[in-house]
Regions:
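Bacterial N-terminal signal peptides
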Residues: 6-17
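A short alpha-helix capping/helix-coil boundary motif
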Residues: 9, 39-42, 75-78
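Short, solvent-exposed, polar/charged sequence segments at loop or secondary-structure edges
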Residues: 67-110
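N-terminal, post-signal-peptide region of Sec/Tat-exported proteins
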Residues: 48-79
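Positively charged n-region of N-terminal signal peptides that target proteins for export
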Residues: 1-5
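Charge-dense, low-complexity intrinsically disordered segments
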Residues: 44, 48-52, 145, 149
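C-terminal/domain-edge helix-coil "capping" segments
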Residues: 22-39, 56-59, 67-69, 94-102, ...
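Short acidic, glycine/proline-rich loop/turn micro-motifs
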Residues: 39-45, 85-86
Length: 166
């Protein structure tokens, strides 16, 4: 019986080590931001449906980054107040790095949706190395249409491009 327990213990340790060895980088994924340069945005400001789409896109990015790109996506909810007060990240030149470091991340991913008009949008993600603060990759896709489905399609294309090394 002691040999069985020993063998079982070794198996558990081996499997745990193998799982840890295959875990991807720890990623701090920050909420998408809207950069609205459209005439509509100038007059009406950010719309409730676009605010909801930002959250939808962020959740989709987090899900796909773990599932498709193999990242260990970190929970940033404990840093929500700091994230809110620090942004917008698309203007700060890497200010998200300190927050990502606090979360224990190896990479920081920020995203932005630039709304040019009701029909033309550009979705972008920027991936930074937390240790150096340098930008590793920038991925962007153009969208035609301002709907939940087009935003989700854009995020999926970004992750597919990133996971494929493109």
């Amino acid at each position: 019986m002691p040999i069985f327990r020993y063998a079982l213990g070794l198996l558990v340790l081996t499997l745990a080590g193998a799982a840890a060895a295959h875990a991807g980088p720890k990623a701090a994924i920050f909420p998408f931001e809207l950069i609205d340069v459209s005439l509509e945005g100038e007059h009406a400001g950010q719309q409730a449906d676009e605010t909801a789409r930002l959250q939808l896109a962020t959740e989709e990015l987090r899900t796909l980054a773990a599932r498709e790109a193999g990242y260990e996506v970190l929970d940033l909810s404990g840093l929500a107040a700091e994230i809110e007060s620090t942004g917008p990240f698309h203007k700060c030149g890497g200010c998200e790095i300190d927050i990502a470091r606090k979360a224990g991340a190896e990479i920081a991913i920020t995203g932005a949706v630039r709304k040019i008009s009701s029909l033309i949008l550009v979705v972008q993600i920027l991936v930074r190395d937390v240790a150096s603060g340098k930008v590793n990759k920038v991925h962007r896709v153009e969208l035609r249409g301002n709907t939940d489905e087009t935003w989700l399609r854009g995020v999926r294309r970004l992750v597919s491009s990133h996971a494929g090394g493109g």
